[in-house]
């Protein structure tokens, strides 16, 4: 530890440079990761916020909830088996100032209400709870909003981060929803569904039980956005490994005479190796921790309309991957360190 720290202080400008590079790479990785998570939440947060593990939909080759039409006789059979109320959905358009906003309207379902950020859930037929992203347009609890057809609705509450396929969710009471939407898609979010109950539901003609992954994999925007963003993150980790590998390898070559002298006076290779690993960990941790602090600060400053989301688990994952990448990137330096011959390094072989 002492040798590693003394060397960092002696070559401080070189190590500051690599810390800055790691800092910039860390910021880019965390920002793109936060963007990927934010876009993902805009696609599936409505499902993530539910307590259900499975969903009953119309039996289609591609299980898309907006296309799930379940007939009344099928609904009666499903409700007899599951005891669950149906979740109904219909697209609507809000008029906000001079702009129009496409939203997904849902009814209120017992035990499956999205988390409320402010206000209360709608109880009257003319009340709605809106997704918090719509507050960026200046809408708050107590305000009135209009649908495209001119019908006015009062905002009773604000839902916390509830969206589906990039559309904000607007919740109404069951009676209010039925009055306003003559046609709607229907699904049944179910929790603790036993194997026998699932088999009974699947035996109902025209419906089937699906998992959340089955549904999210069929959202076109979800797959189209996540694949390139995840590829960018992987590419940045590869670039980080190459940069760190080149830096520490060059540093090792430049220190060959010093390494030779240390080996000649009896210092074991494992001590030199541990010093190198400590240097890698110190430089990587400092750069990554600062980048985490910067991104965390930015996440609080970004507007609610920005699709950006970071979690503690995601931040810890990135830190862990960076450390692994740094160690992998320094393998060439480890090999060079083992191969240094003390006599040749100090010129004794001439």
Swiss-Prot record:
Superkingdom, taxonomy of origin: Bacteria
Disulfide bridge partners, by residue number: none
Transmembrane portions of the chain: 16-36, 233-253, 275-295, 315-335
Localization per record: Cell membrane
Membrane-protein topology: Multi-pass membrane protein
InterPro entries membership: ABC-4/HrtB_transporter, ABC3_permease_C
One GO cellular component term noted in the UniProt record for this chain: plasma membrane
Alphabetical UniProt keywords: Cell membrane, Membrane, Transmembrane, Transmembrane helix, Transport
Protein family according to the UniProt entry: Belongs to the ABC-4 integral membrane protein family. HrtB subfamily.
PANTHER family according to UniProt: ABC TRANSPORTER, MEMBRANE PROTEIN, HEMIN TRANSPORT SYSTEM PERMEASE PROTEIN HRTB-RELATED
Subunit structure: The complex is composed of two ATP-binding proteins (HrtA), two transmembrane proteins (HrtB) and a solute-binding protein.
Role played: Part of the ABC transporter complex hrt involved in hemin import. Responsible for the translocation of the substrate across the membrane.
Name this protein carries in UniProt: Putative hemin transport system permease protein HrtB
């Amino acid at each position: 530890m002492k040798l590693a720290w003394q060397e960092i202080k002696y070559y401080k400008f070189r190590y500051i440079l690599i810390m800055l590079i790691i800092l910039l790479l860390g910021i880019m990785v965390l920002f793109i990761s936060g963007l990927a998570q934010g876009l993902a939440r805009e696609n599936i947060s409505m499902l993530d916020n539910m307590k259900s593990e499975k969903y009953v939909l119309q039996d289609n080759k591609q299980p898309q909830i907006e296309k799930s039409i379940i007939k009344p006789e099928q609904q009666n059979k499903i409700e007899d088996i599951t005891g669950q109320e149906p979740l109904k959905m219909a697209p609507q358009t809000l008029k906000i100032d001079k702009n129009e906003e496409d939203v997904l309207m849902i009814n209120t379902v017992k035990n499956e209400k999205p988390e409320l950020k402010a206000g209360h859930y709608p109880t009257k037929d003319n009340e709605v709870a809106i997704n918090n992203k719509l507050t960026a347009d200046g809408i708050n609890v107590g305000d009135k909003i209009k649908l495209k057809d001119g019908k006015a609705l009062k905002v009773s509450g604000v839902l916390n981060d509830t969206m589906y396929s990039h559309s904000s969710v607007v919740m109404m009471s069951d009676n209010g929803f039925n009055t306003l939407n003559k046609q709607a898609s229907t699904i049944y979010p179910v929790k603790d569904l036993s194997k026998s109950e699932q088999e009974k539901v699947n035996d109902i003609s025209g419906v089937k039980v699906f998992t959340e992954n089955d549904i999210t994999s069929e959202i076109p925007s979800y797959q189209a956005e996540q694949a390139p963003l995840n590829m960018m993150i992987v590419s940045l980790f590869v670039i980080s490994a190459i940069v760190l590998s080149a830096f520490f390898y060059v540093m090792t070559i430049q220190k060959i005479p010093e390494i030779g002298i240390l080996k000649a006076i009896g210092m074991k290779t494992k001590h030199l190796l541990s010093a190198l690993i400590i240097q890698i960990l110190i430089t990587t941790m400092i750069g990554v921790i600062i980048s985490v602090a910067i991104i965390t600060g930015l996440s609080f400053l970004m507007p609610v309309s920005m699709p950006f989301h970071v979690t503690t688990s995601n931040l810890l994952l990135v830190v862990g991957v960076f450390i692994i990448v740094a160690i992998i990137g320094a393998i060439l330096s480890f090999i060079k360190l083992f191969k240094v011959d003390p006599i040749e390094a100090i010129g004794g072989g001439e």
